[in-house]
Design a protein with these regions (language model features):
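Mid-to-C-terminal alpha-helical segments outside catalytic/metal-binding sites
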Residues: 156-187
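Proteins with a high burden of low-complexity, intrinsically disordered sequence enriched in S/T/G/P/A and R
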Residues: 1-6, 14, 181-189
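Second-shell residues forming the walls of enzyme active-site clefts
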Residues: 3-156, 160-166
């Protein structure tokens, strides 16, 4: 049995079990990290090589999407074959691959916006806005410091036209819909 088949089977079984128990499962890190040079939390990380090297990873993501995973988290690394300028969590191109090519219509959660590889020299506020603009619905920030400033930056970005109001409304609607779907389903006893 190939590694991708084994990973798919285990991942799908885990997702089904977790979601049957009333928890929203999240598949990560899209589009896969078959090789990174550095730890993305503390250094800039890039996954080099042609898009074909991601085929096995993308097949696993197709399987977990087919199994009904409710959320996917784009990773912190840059994938030059898809988008040479943005980390996966702030890349509209990576998120388009997830949505358009793989047909994922669920919740997209950014990876930790405090990660050096996601920040890429930008402020946390700008990175949060970039992630939403790229198509994330929910932002992960590992510390509570600066949450008010992030919220203010998002409001300012909408006011200034940097972030479309409709994008923010769609993100909040998606988060509420997924949360509501979990509340309406009974938990396994």
């Amino acid at each position: 049995m190939s590694a991708k088949v084994l990973v798919s089977r285990i991942s799908c079984a885990f997702i089904r079990g977790v979601q049957r128990a009333g928890v929203i499962a999240t598949a990560k890190h899209f589009p896969g990290h078959y090789a990174t040079e550095h730890d993305p939390a503390i250094a800039l990380a890039t996954v080099h090589g042609p898009l074909e090297l991601l085929d096995d990873n993308l097949q696993v993501f197709r399987q977990v999407i087919g199994a009904g995973v409710q959320a996917v988290m784009p990773g912190p690394a840059v994938f030059p074959a898809i988008d040479p300028d943005q980390s996966a969590s702030t890349s509209a191109k990576v998120i388009a691959l997830l949505r358009d090519t793989l047909g994922f219509d669920g919740l997209i959660i950014s990876d930790d916006l405090d990660a050096v590889s996601i920040l890429r020299g930008n402020t946390l506020n700008d990175t949060a806005v970039a992630s939403l603009a790229a198509g994330a619905h929910l932002l992960l920030v590992s510390s509570e410091s600066g949450l008010d400033a992030i919220a203010e930056a998002i409001v300012s970005a909408v006011d200034e036209g940097t972030l479309e109001r409709q994008v923010l409304l769609a993100a909040s609607s998606k988060v509420r819909a997924v949360a509501k779907s979990r509340q309406s389903e009974p938990l396994i006893k």
